């Protein structure tokens, strides 16, 4: 049973791809037609693949597997953080630091430092230091929070990574390939499905499109962990996001 309707996908503008001249021929099987120089994505396949992704991730979540959401572009950053937190998953929504997965031992030490500084800040210890020393520690804390806040409770590598915008997150995807971590990725018409485990052909630029797809995946994770999704927790795009 599909977890999304074609009407929902259409309303969110999921079908709008990039300009035809910017396409990746490997996306040909997922393109329905070309209209006014713009590729139109086949939403039947989008619905099928999104359903497949959600079924897989729901089962994985039920089995205790951990998911990392990744989306650092402006349109995706807020959505990624919000939806990951809603389903108690990890996220990266600022710059991807090279080696976040392949050099996890080093990154883990920085995560530990973040937690240490947060504890010192909460206890008031930083406030008791001389102003210059306190300022240095606060700058360090702000920097660590910016890049690592979404993974500060991550104690091991994720089991699945959900990616918004393959072209932007190439480094992260290569790290997943190297480590054998499965990926689910929103793929626009300028991307390659060959390096992704489950591609979801869709508009990766429109806020409503990103919100719909990432939200459905978060719903599946929530369902896998806790049972039926609490509809009151699901947020919808505000008028300013449309």
Curated annotation (Swiss-Prot):
Location of this chain's protein in the cell: Plastid, Chloroplast
CDD domains, alphabetized: RPS2
InterPro entries the UniProt entry points to: Ribosomal_uS2 (IPR001865), Ribosomal_uS2_bac/mit/plastid (IPR005706), Ribosomal_uS2_CS (IPR018130), Ribosomal_uS2_flav_dom_sf (IPR023591)
SUPFAM superfamilies given in the database record: Ribosomal protein S2 (SSF52313)
Keyword Ribonucleoprotein listed: yes
Highest taxon of the lineage: Eukaryota
GO biological process: translation
Transmembrane segments: none
Keyword entries, A-Z: Chloroplast, Plastid, Ribonucleoprotein, Ribosomal protein
Gene Ontology cellular component list: chloroplast; small ribosomal subunit
Main location: plastid
Molecular-function GO terms, alphabetical: structural constituent of ribosome
Pfam families: Ribosomal_S2
Entry similarity comment: Belongs to the universal ribosomal protein uS2 family.
HAMAP family, A to Z: Ribosomal_uS2_B
Protein name as annotated: Small ribosomal subunit protein uS2c
Species annotation: Pyropia yezoensis (Susabi-nori)
